[in-house]
């Protein structure tokens, strides 16, 4: 497995490295890890050019070197303690551009990024490196926030499904790289269904139609839940994942998934993402974005 680890010297980069180092089963497969640091002063080419003119190229080179060393130092310890080989690479580009270009060139199987957590999804993602990377690549991205790395190899994982093909895409990825989850992970297949009774009451108030009974509404919820989860549960079990449980949640998908993950202490949340051609729609309209913003555990986004 090839893993790209972009770093910026923050505590979140260190947490991302610690998550990788916690994957004992993965380390046994000897993954290739590249640690990438992008140097881009104040996000401006002009700033770098002006400083080069004022300070001189030699001084600017030293600044780049010191900043890169600081970024690498933050992740070396957790990787080296586990004896994990990795290589370091520094480029002079905007961070998102650097990650996307290296992804296209090196073709990693996974990008692991530390990201600062906020409760407001728009504040978290608009203008952030994480957003640009998610919008610009189809390679799976693992976003690590401020939760400590799992202490055990076997993870408690939530896979969010909605009846779309992305649930099966996520299953295929996890089957191929199952060492990410440990030898015997506990998997919860999460499906959020609409509150059928409330939906029917709302619909009946807009037109002349009979209101269904609560029992009929609940049967509709169960039917939807069964249709959305059964194929994924069966596929996981067929692929050798023994501990798989379907979980029904009712309400708003983003809120219910994140609150369940936090309440149950999940070690990892896995989600498929359709991707969008409209960038703002991807940021503000995505359940995936909401979950990534509000869930303490790392979130693996597979497209």
Residue ranges with predicted function:
Residues 1-55, 84, 155-211, 235-239:
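Small/aliphatic-rich secondary-structure junction motif
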Residues 6, 89, 114, 160, ...:
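Active-site-adjacent beta-strand anchor residues
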Residues 22, 28, 62, 66, ...:
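Structural beta-alpha unit
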Residues 34-36, 87-91, 142, 188-190, ...:
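General small-molecule cofactor/ligand-binding pocket signal
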Residues 55-67, 211-224:
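A short acidic, glycine-rich active-site loop
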Residues 68-72, 76, 222-229, 233:
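N-terminal membrane-insertion helices
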